[in-house]
Amino acid sequence: MNFILFLLILILNSSSIISAGLQVKGNKLYDGNGNELIFRGINIAHAWFADRTKFSLNEINSLGANSARIVLATGHKWTKTSYSDLEKIISWCENDGLICVLEVHDFTGSDDPNDIISLAVNYWSEMKNLLNEHQNYVIVNIANEWLGSWNKGSLWGDTYSSAIKALRAIGLKNAIMVDASGWGQETGPIIENAHRVLESDPDKNVIFSYHVYAVLGKDDNSLISGFDGLKKTGVCWIVGEFGWFHSGANVAYKTLMNYCQNNGIGWIAWSWSGNGGDDACLDLTSSSTFSGKDLSDWGKYVFFGEGGIEKTSKKAYGGSGGNDNYGYCEGCEITATGDDGSKWGYENGKSCRIDINKCNGSGTDIAPNGFPYCSSCDVTVTGEDGIRWGWENNKSCVINESKC
């Protein structure tokens, strides 16, 4: 009898290895196994580049991201993301071990409560069964940057409280995310009303989100003040979007990443690729290729900089992320250099570490700093450290002083 009871307990436990769904407890988010989850993710513009979504998710996974925030559409402004499309997106995220934050972008900047309480809720209601099946990986970000106006804290709190009650009433079980007002950058309303919004959810499973650009992130003091204010409320919050430059001004992105690392706060950078006009500088990689092989300077910092994904990302449910996700390259071709001096290549569709010891002694003409030696002696620039550089085959190379 005792042996049978033991087997029954074992079966019950094994069937619930991943069962609780993503859950907020206090100011932290936990996966279904009870592991703390700190977002280190990337925004993916599915609504405008649907044919690139699967590839983009594979790329950010190969670079170590643990999450993706996906731009969807209800059909009110852009082509509707259908049930079958959403099913594919979720499966791609899960196959890559990425926590999937889903947001509808149609109501960005809108001040109309009906857009949230009716239109956004109706869209999520249509998708409810699919969303509930995947509550271990899916978070519902009700709407991107609803309420563009400032100083309307009561409207923000009332509207989101009503929307959350409506979503729970139709049976949605997923964790919910709510953006700040003022295009995601206003601090007062979210600080003053976050607890009221949280209390509207019978599950108390709400994550709050700042978006950081040239207002909230205009300087270190503004950013730290806004972050400290929300931190003091004790709610669970993340940075759902941020860039390095916006509206003609720099953003305190390095301070942001350091603050988040020091305080256990998650972030999701904007955005993988496809930005237009003045926002093209926010592309993390080439808009032509969408490839992790072609990271911009912004992309290199997000992945390899201080507090970046390479150093800090940990996958949910014990999956590999950050350094654990990489092996050494077979070859010695360098495509990026981390802030810590690490050299990186790109092979077989994913990033890999350059084995400097192997490459320096392999006869491949690799300089001690990990870059290849030039075949010629034509100098294009001299670094502050005295190293002379050339340019061959559309890449930087080191002048070989022993030959030149």
Which positions does each model-derived feature cover?
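Structural motif
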Residues: 37-39, 65-67, 97-99, 135-137, ...
